[in-house]
């Protein structure tokens, strides 16, 4: 379980040290050990959510993230220590939509812990991580984050620390302003490539693409953790050629074999998109800078043939 620092979501080109992995829950504490941090805790499933929550929380709560960097949340399995570590948290923040609901199947794991689904108030796009679910990747649209995620984060953390409600609300307002500025920056950065199509490693970018006028034509990985079949890859090649695609994107959390094969067949370059980022990932170690990174990558890739 990774701790998030209590600081603003990262802006452009910044970096900072992050705390180490937590000690096992319930370990004994002798008199010569450092005193425990008694700050109330909140748990977030993925890094972007944890980073947003850490800013809103400030020093009022310690936010811990379950999924480590470079892991795929849709195939992630929490360890027994991580499951045990949820006990006693003041809030459990999850995305929902079938992507990060692993603990809901563990009897008693969330007993007594208030659970908040960020996607609970959003009409999800088609194309989810599980049977009958919609696309859960709503955090890649900063307007949805500002208008839907942020109020839920604020309410959950204020309920966890009612004595700190005014400070939590003030930090949420400041974050809303930063998200508005990010949206404006992305809209301007992507304006020259509006209407252009790209192929991603997996279908994570529908909300982002719809917000900023680009088109996610298709994805290499149709199922989490599985490389595409030869037939599926051939169909994607035909569709990409017909649409004039000249960029393919990989992601750090998924295998590159299919994406590299597709790019070689199309004779187009490969770029990196990162839906999750993480502590210590240069240029992607905070929500704001992560979205800027991805917007810049798409703008560069789609603008390279203009």
What do these predicted regions represent?
Residues 29-306:
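Extracytoplasmic metal-acquisition and chelation regions
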């Amino acid at each position: 379980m990774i701790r998030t620092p209590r600081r603003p979501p990262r802006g452009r080109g910044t970096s900072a040290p992050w705390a180490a992995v937590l000690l096992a829950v319930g370990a004994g504490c002798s008199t010569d050990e450092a005193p425990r941090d008694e700050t109330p805790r909140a748990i977030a499933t993925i890094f972007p959510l944890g980073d947003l929550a850490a800013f809103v929380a400030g020093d009022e709560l310690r936010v811990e993230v379950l999924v480590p960097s470079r892991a795929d949340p849709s195939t992630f399995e929490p360890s027994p220590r991580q499951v045990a570590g949820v006990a006693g948290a003041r809030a459990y923040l999850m995305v929902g939509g079938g992507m990060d609901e692993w603990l809901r199947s563990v009897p008693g794991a969330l007993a007594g812990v208030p659970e908040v689904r960020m996607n609970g108030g959003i009409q999800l796009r088609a194309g989810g991580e599980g049977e009958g679910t919609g696309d859960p990747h709503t955090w890649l649209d900063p307007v949805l984050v500002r208008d839907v995620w942020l109020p839920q984060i604020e309410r959950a953390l204020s309920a966890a620390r009612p004595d700190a409600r005014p400070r939590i609300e003030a930090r949420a307002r400041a974050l809303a302003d930063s998200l508005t500025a990010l949206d404006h920056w992305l809209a301007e950065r992507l304006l020259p490539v509006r209407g252009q199509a790209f192929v991603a490693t997996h279908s994570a970018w529908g909300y982002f693409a719809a917000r900023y006028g680009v088109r996610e034509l298709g994805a290499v990985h149709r199922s989490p953790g599985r490389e595409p079949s030869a037939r599926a890859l051939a169909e994607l090649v035909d569709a990409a050629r017909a649409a004039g695609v000249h960029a393919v994107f990989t992601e750090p959390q998924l295998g590159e074999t299919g994406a590299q094969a597709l790019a070689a067949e199309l004779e187009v370059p490969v770029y990196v998109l990162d839906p999750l980022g993480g502590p210590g990932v240069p240029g992607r170690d905070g929500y704001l800078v992560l979205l800027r990174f991805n917007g810049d990558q798409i703008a560069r890739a789609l603008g390279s043939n203009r």
